[in-house]
Amino acid sequence: MFYKIAQKVMFQMDPERAHNLAIGSLKMTGNSPLNCFYRQTIAPAPVTFMGLTFPNPVGLAAGMDKDGESIDAFHAMGFGHIEVGTVTPRPQPGNDLPRLFRLKPAKGIINRMGFNNKGVDNLVRNLIAKKSDIMVGVNIGKNKDTPVEQGKDDYLICMDKVYPYAAYIAVNISSPNTPGLRSLQYGDLLDELLSAIKTKQLELAEKHKKYVPIALKIAPDLTIEEIENIADALIKNKFDGAIATNTTLTRDGVSGLANANESGGLSGKPLTELSTKVIRQLAACLKGQIPIIGVGGINSAEDALAKFDAGATMVQIYSGFIYQGPKLIKEIVEAYRLK
């Protein structure tokens, strides 16, 4: 009930202003009695992923809490893990406003945020300051003004700084809102990046005496051949996991709606089937050697179960969480326990 009232107010506001207000409010209330308005108890449904044990298979996707400011509040809602970021080595403002748009009739969102964040050093401070013991994955990317050819350096800088504090690290090469970023998904650029990241991971594991798994986040706008090539590169470079998928550049199912022609990545319900298709194709290519987090268009427990059936071990929500609220977490976990 509280969420529906809050949502009604927020949906009258500019989307980015509403988002910032929500994150700020959650930051203030995460460890206070006021978290009673969104705190919920989720029955355990443990799942093992990349060698880690999570209390349940439902996570918060990257992009909601980019700078890790409200981790404790999201823990109170019952998430099994939170993925913060995308974070870059240096702070950057992102793309020009406006850059976030609701497509309410389709339960979709278009964003062209452009990795706006306060930088990796700020994120590390927030990871150190968090009170809860929730699993936190850190999604890393490159700065906009870093040439693609030098992009791997940005990923290695972020890895070096977040490694001691992350449950896992997610490598984001699939956002459509940083020029040239998606080119890292192909050919020699992909192989060079994954090889450099794996080498760095092993160095850091030795230095810190702990192994932090690494997953690659991919786009939904890929051909089967491209998916096969990515799968081969993941296996070759012994990556620990994959996250499928990011937002799409397609506009299937939203034609004619207000804001549908805005540039950027489309998420939410219009992405559901495409994301599930990519998960199924990727799982077939990986042949059980590398586990997958399924994300994209999960608006119900049924949507999540479809991701599991397609080959995902865990799922993440973002747009569905905005439209459905924290109850979606509990609904998915309960359905997972019964499946």
Swiss-Prot record:
Q: Spell out the reaction equation it catalyses.
A: (S)-dihydroorotate + a quinone = orotate + a quinol
Q: Where in the cell is it found?
A: Cell membrane
| GO biological process assignments | 'de novo' pyrimidine nucleobase biosynthetic process; 'de novo' UMP biosynthetic process
What is its EC class?
oxidoreductase
In terms of superkingdom, the source organism counts as: Bacteria
One Pfam entry name:
DHO_dh
- Family matches, as PROSITE patterns: DHODEHASE_1, DHODEHASE_2
Q: Which InterPro entries match?
A: Aldolase_TIM, DHO_dehydrogenase, Dihydroorotate_DH_1_2, Dihydroorotate_DH_2, Dihydroorotate_DH_cat, Dihydroorotate_DH_CS
> What GO CC terms are in its UniProt record?
cytoplasm; plasma membrane
What residues does substrate bind to?
66, 111-115, 172, 177, 246-247
Co-factor requirement? FMN
- Please provide, alphabetically and separated by semicolons, the GO molecular function terms listed in this UniProt record: dihydroorotate dehydrogenase (quinone) activity
At which positions is FMN bound? 62-66, 86, 139, 172, 217, 245, 268, 297, 318-319
Keywords in alphabetical order, please: Cell membrane, Flavoprotein, FMN, Membrane, Oxidoreductase, Pyrimidine biosynthesis
Where is this protein chiefly located?
Answer: membrane
Cofactor binding comment, as recorded: Binds 1 FMN per subunit.
Residues at the active site: 175
Q: How would you describe this protein's topology in the membrane? A: Peripheral membrane protein
The entry sums up its family as follows: Belongs to the dihydroorotate dehydrogenase family. Type 2 subfamily.
**How does this polypeptide assemble, per the annotation?**
Monomer.
Q: What does this protein do?
A: Catalyzes the conversion of dihydroorotate to orotate with quinone as electron acceptor.
Its protein name is: Dihydroorotate dehydrogenase (quinone)
Q: Which organism is it from?
A: Shewanella sp. (strain W3-18-1)
